[in-house]
From Swiss-Prot:
EC numbers: 1.2.1.38
Family that this chain belongs to: Belongs to the NAGSA dehydrogenase family. Type 1 subfamily.
Keyword vocabulary terms for this entry: Amino-acid biosynthesis, Arginine biosynthesis, Cytoplasm, NADP, Oxidoreductase
Lineage: Bacteria, Pseudomonadati, Pseudomonadota, Betaproteobacteria, Burkholderiales
Name of the protein in its database record: N-acetyl-gamma-glutamyl-phosphate reductase
Pathway membership, UniProt: Amino-acid biosynthesis; L-arginine biosynthesis; N(2)-acetyl-L-ornithine from L-glutamate: step 3/4
GO terms (BP aspect): L-arginine biosynthetic process
HAMAP family listed in its UniProt record: ArgC_type1
Gene3D superfamilies the UniProt entry points to: Dihydrodipicolinate Reductase, domain 2, NAD(P)-binding Rossmann-like Domain
Chain's role: Catalyzes the NADPH-dependent reduction of N-acetyl-5-glutamyl phosphate to yield N-acetyl-L-glutamate 5-semialdehyde.
Uppermost EC category: oxidoreductase
Compartments reported by the entry: Cytoplasm
Length: 354
């Protein structure tokens, strides 16, 4: 594991113009151990970052540069806030130079290249690097992340579903029926990215609430692969994502049928014990109901454990900011571990209210 030194970590960002890119900039500009070194955008080459994102005035003095002009191999770590396929095309060169890679897209999330190619419709060009990569969900893979050279940063939906279900199934626990799991998830519009699309237009998304990807969503195989790794066997999951008319935030309602032999389990205590030492996972008091606004612009994820009527249906409520714990904040959390830094370095922001 690389150890943090007195010198700052030299950080590059490929694809700094999207929402996850600017969120990385916001977080890293406040990080006590980071020196932002390069931010790439072919289209915005030469444009000062603060001209595009005025919230960064006085914080980020760099200008965007075309990828071929940026000295990414001089960085200690490079974040890819890019479409799928970009990181895998550049990873080998960076790794050869000793630069670590954290990809916020899906290039290193799925270990099965056939599954990746089926869902993302592009060939996987570096299966050897993929085999050495680590799935970057800190609360599940902390030790492996600390030694990793390549991180596949989890998707936003998978983060809520996996952390919401892990205490129930990890280690092959026989507490709930793993064949009938349901994830009913809602995301703010920023989850669709910054590109111009009809479905993200104000007139389309405002005052509207809709499901999408019901027949199949790219995060489904990612979630199932990790659930099966936790459970040690096959898992059945019904996953239905929704788009809600807010900018940022995610609310996932998870359903699990309690097995007869587990009816006397104290599920509140189970979750509290599992996440007692996690700096960014908050298991709320019994009977509490989480709200997306309670995590806005923070790296916190809040979980509420519910058992309506004391019956056999367990309901787990999970909220996070899809751009922070669901993307860029989680990526910074991974970087901290990779370089031997305190896990919460640069991530201690309090959520914004109202």
């Amino acid at each position: 594991m690389a150890q943090a030194s007195n010198s700052r970590i030299k950080v590059g960002i490929v694809g700094g113009t999207g929402y996850t890119g600017v969120e990385l900039l916001r977080l890293l500009s406040q990080h006590p151990h980071v020196a932002l070194t390069a931010i790439t955008s072919r289209k915005e080459d030469g444009l000062p970052v603060a001209d595009m994102y005025p919230n960064l005035r006085g914080r980020v003095k760099l200008a965007f540069s075309a990828p071929e002009k940026a000295s990414l191999t001089d960085c200690d770590v490079v974040f890819f806030a890019t479409p799928h396929g970009v990181a895998m095309a550049q990873a080998a060169e960076l790794l050869a130079a000793g630069t670590r890679v954290i990809d916020l897209a899906a290039d290193f999330r799925l270990q099965d290249t056939a599954v990746f190619e089926r869902w993302y419709k592009i060939p996987h060009t570096c299966p050897d690097i993929l085999a050495d990569s680590v799935y970057g969900l800190v609360e599940l893979n902390r030790e492996a992340i600390s030694k990793a050279r390549v991180i596949g940063n989890p998707g936003c939906y998978p983060t809520t579903v996996l952390l919401g279900l892990a205490p129930l199934i990890e280690g092959g626990k026989q507490l709930v029926d793993v064949q009938t799991l349901i994830a009913d998830c809602k995301s703010g519009v920023s989850g669709a990215g910054r590109k111009a699309e009809v479905g993200s237009l104000f007139s389309e998304a405002s005052d509207n609430f809709k499901a999408y990807g019901v027949a199949g969503h790219r995060h489904q195989p990612e979630i199932v692969a990790q659930l099966e790794k936790l459970a040690g066997g096959k898992v059945g999951l019904t996953f239905v994502p929704h788009l809600v008319p807010m900018i940022r935030g995610m609310f996932s309602t998870l359903y699990a049928r309690i097995l007869p032999q587990a009816r006397d389990t104290d599920f509140q205590a189970l979750f509290e014990a599992r996440y007692a030492d996690e700096p960014f996972v908050d298991v709320m008091p019994a009977g509490s109901l989480p709200e997306t606004r309670s995590v806005r612009a923070s790296n916190n994820l809040r979980i509420s454990v519910q058992r309506p009527g004391g019956g056999d249906q367990l309901v787990i409520l999970v909220v996070q900011d899809n751009l922070v714990k669901g993307a860029s904040g989680q990526a910074v959390q991974n970087m901290n571990l990779m370089f031997g830094l305190p896990e919460s370095a640069g991530l201690d922001q309090v959520a914004i209210l109202p």
